[in-house]
Amino acid sequence: MEQIRLLLLLTIRVLSGSAQFNGYNCDANLHSRFPAERDISVYCGVQAITMKINFCTVLFSGYSETDLALNGRHGDSHCRGFINNNTFPAVVIFIINLSTLEGCGNNLVVSTIPGVSAYGNATSVQIGNISGYIDTPDPPTIISYLPGLLYKFSCSYPLEYLVNNTQLASSSAAISVRENNGTFVSTLNLLLYNDSTYNQQLIIPSIGLPLKTKVFAAVQATNLDGRWNVLMDYCYTTPSGNPNDDIRYDLFLSCDKDPQTTVIENGRSQRGRFSFEVFRFVKHKNQKMSTVFLHCVTKLCRADDCPFLMPICSHRERRDAGRRTTWSSQSSSGSAVLSAGPIITRSDETPTNNSQLGSPSVPPFQLNAITSALISGMVILGVMSFSLLVCPLALLHRKGPTSLVLNGIRNPVFD
């Protein structure tokens, strides 16, 4: 009788839990609780901010998906989420497009981060922080027995990316150069192009560039006479728009150069040019797309003195270095950090494709079941044939020496 009562209680509990979750992909044993901080996931993507909220705990708290809205905009259907019941647990998804990030009252705060480049130049980057919340409406009564739900989120991006995330942003820098007869100011720009003609600027599709796509970069100067050239000291990449990011990958620095990077022109004219193949940062391994920002530390140098400011890499240049004359402090200007990006790259989802991108495209040799069986049969047949050939030879070899040592009676006829 006690067992029947226990079974009846368990059945009632399961039925009540199923009724409470209304057939959604929830577990009454796991999700019969109020929401916690772990019930929201925030993804700061390259084109949108995505929030996923555990819908099961929302149901347990007595609310539905229509009760959740961005920043208290419960009367605006565009500020609500939608349910995805194909996951466990079921979730409510909110998506904020970066192109319309302030549509539902999200807050954008701009701050400036100071920094110092490798050459000691002071740099600053403007960062845009997007923040907001998702909540339930206040009840019309004085008291309520339902808990109020509140989920907060925040994402940070380079400001130039938020201004127009559909196009590449490029920074410029003004360099002041002092001469004997005065001072002039030249403006430098870092631009990205599709091909080696440098006619059409780089256009990135919404799905991103495939890995190993070749991108052509150019540093150009304006308001510059023929006595001065552009010299790129070094160029590197970061996953964010901050040139001082702790994660960086050098494309070329002094005599060291990335194997996929080609310096086309540097220090020989009023434009520096190079190309490189796009990649993804490993820190973006859980994302379908990766962001790459390009930075170049650049200066102006006198056309006659630029070769002397280039790094000495070959043995001949080292031998001839002693013949070089000294130059004055007016031979070059101060350095400036130029940035461009983001370059959005997409990663193939299959590991095989990723590994093939970094190796020669030689199709791997694979054995199917039939081929393996044929090879195995040929090996067995060869072993048996070899055994049949070796055994008689071994017997003959064993009998031969024995017959040679046989002794008989001497025949007198041969005397």
Swiss-Prot record:
The gene is ZPLD1. Residues 350-359 have a biased composition (Polar residues). The keyword Cell inner membrane does not apply. The chain crosses the membrane at residues 373-393. Residues 1-19 form the signal peptide. This is Zona pellucida-like domain-containing protein 1. Glycoprotein which is a component of the gelatinous extracellular matrix in the cupulae of the vestibular organ. Residues 323-359 are annotated as: Disordered. Proteolytically cleaved before the transmembrane segment to yield the secreted form found in the extracellular matrix of the cupula. The keyword Transmembrane helix applies. Glycans are attached at N164. Residues 43-320 form the ZP domain. Residues 328-339 have a biased composition (Low complexity). GO terms for cellular component: cytoplasmic vesicle membrane; extracellular region. Residues 394-415 are cytoplasmic. InterPro entries: ZP-C, ZP-C_dom, ZP-N, ZP_dom. The record marks R319, D320 as: Cleavage. SMART domains: ZP. PROSITE patterns: ZP_2. Residues 20-372 are extracellular. It comes from Macaca fascicularis (Crab-eating macaque). Disulfide bonds join C44-C155, C79-C104, C235-C296, C255-C313.
